[in-house]
Design a protein with these regions (language model features):
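Glycine-rich phosphate-binding loops of nucleotide-dependent enzymes
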Residues: 2-267
Length: 267
């Protein structure tokens, strides 16, 4: 049975001067799925992520995010993300990681995750500055929540270590955990296996599956490691020159001559 999309784009285009980075992209991510987006370098994959998360405003088209119902019988709520700021999009339940790790290297592992909790906090700037009772209670709750996340996903013992002292694979893991701290319903992973060795990539495969199972969320990942893509994904979308050229199950994509010519057969 086809699940409803948690996010979809309709005719999404992005231009930079005369350069067309995205050209009428119509993509869907089914709720609860692990979906991959692949394509050669320069295909427009990260530009698409940047549009989904509010970093780039689309030139044309729509980005529609499906929110939870107000009640069990009510219709699903749909929000157009086009004109929202990145923080507003995060608050709706969309989080991402980046191809280049963006940790606070001189903060501890726990402090990095606490920063990810910021969108969940309700006390506001005034409460934080004045150290109100509510703000202090929230800080305690978020510290406990952050520690639980670290323990759940294998970094509990490193909570007080500086982020820069973690092995590279654990830095990738920390960035994903920090994204989870925002409380997402959709997690975007931009080349999470970049720079990982085989053992670290296998651990990442396990982590992605575990997160989907435990957190009941949807995952969209950009990835060049085709072994990981074929292992973990339920559906694969393929981009080339800013356009979607194929979509299907991993086995279908692997044997699609258009995809082989455009991407899988490179080199």
């Amino acid at each position: 049975m086809t699940r409803p999309p948690i996010i979809e784009t309709r005719g999404l285009s992005k231009t930079f001067g005369g350069l067309v980075a995205l050209d009428e992209v119509a993509l869907q991510v089914e709720e609860g799925s692990i979906t991959a987006l692949i394509g050669p370098n320069g295909a427009g994959k990260t530009t698409l992520f940047n549009c989904l998360t509010g970093i780039y405003p689309p030139t044309r088209g729509r980005i529609i995010f499906r929110r939870p119902r107000d009640s069990e019988t009510g219709p699903p709520l749909k929000t157009t993300l086009n004109d929202l700021r990145p923080d507003q999009i995060t608050a709706l339940g969309l989080a991402r990681t980046f191809q280049n790790i963006r940790l606070f290297n001189n903060l501890t592992v726990l402090e990095n995750v606490l920063i990810g909790c910021h969108p969940r906090m309700k006390a506001g700037l005034w409460g934080a500055l004045m150290r109100t009772r509510r703000a202090r209670a929230e800080e305690r709750d978020m510290a406990e929540f952050s520690m639980l996340l670290l323990e759940k996903y294998g970094l509990g013992a490193a909570a007080n270590d500086l982020a820069k002292n973690l092995p590279y694979g654990d830095q990738r893991r920390l960035e994903i955990i920090r994204a989870l701290a925002t409380g997402p319903r959709l997690l975007l992973l931009d080349e999470p296996a970049a720079g990982l060795n085989i053992a670290e990539t296998n651990a990442l495969d396990e982590l992605i599956r575990l997160i989907r199972e435990r957190e009941n969320l949807s995952i969209l990942l950009i990835e060049h490691d085709m072994t990981l893509v074929m292992s973990v994904s339920e559906k694969v979308w393929v981009m080339e020159y800013g356009r979607l050229i194929a979509a299907g199950a991993p086995g279908e994509i692997k044997n699609d001559p258009v995809v082989i010519r455009a991407y899988l057969g490179e080199g």
